[in-house]
Amino acid sequence: MQDAWVEQMEQTLNPMSVPMDNPIGTIESKDRQAILAALLVHLWHGYRKMRDCLMELEDAMLQGNREQARSLLLQIKRFCGTSFRYEEDAVLPALDHHIGSEQLHELTAAHDLVIRHVRRLEGLLSTSPGGEEQIEQGRMLIHALLMQVACTAGLTLLIETLPQDALIRILQARERALVEGKDLYEWDKDIRG
């Protein structure tokens, strides 16, 4: 059973680069289980992609491959921009009754921390190689980002409990965020203000 799930996950299109097939026009006709399954597959792929990019970024930094590290950081910024957009627009408001406003505030503050960590990583990659200390600083930031991915992925346990209309709103918000394609800084400046 687990192998079938992994196989299905591997065969699904990468949600980082391909929006879903017009979910806004047809999703209402599907049952809750189908909607939930589609949402969880897309969320899971996104979190896996982010995890993989962060782990590859750490490897690139350890190998001194700054060009690859900068390329991976661009992917991370794009993922975070779209992901944080639909999380703050639809996921977090839908979970308010489960976790309360204080936890919602902490999750939103975690997005601010991610922005600071990504900026620090960019700073490390924009300067001349600084040796072991610079690499260790980068690794600490990457590890903190990996923990944030793991914590956010855990929200899927609560998303599973949401009613169909909330699931549809999350899928629609996700689709809009992917179509807009704002990176982390654009989202923070243009959308959050």
Where do the PLM segments sit?
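Small-residue-biased structural context
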Residues: 1-193
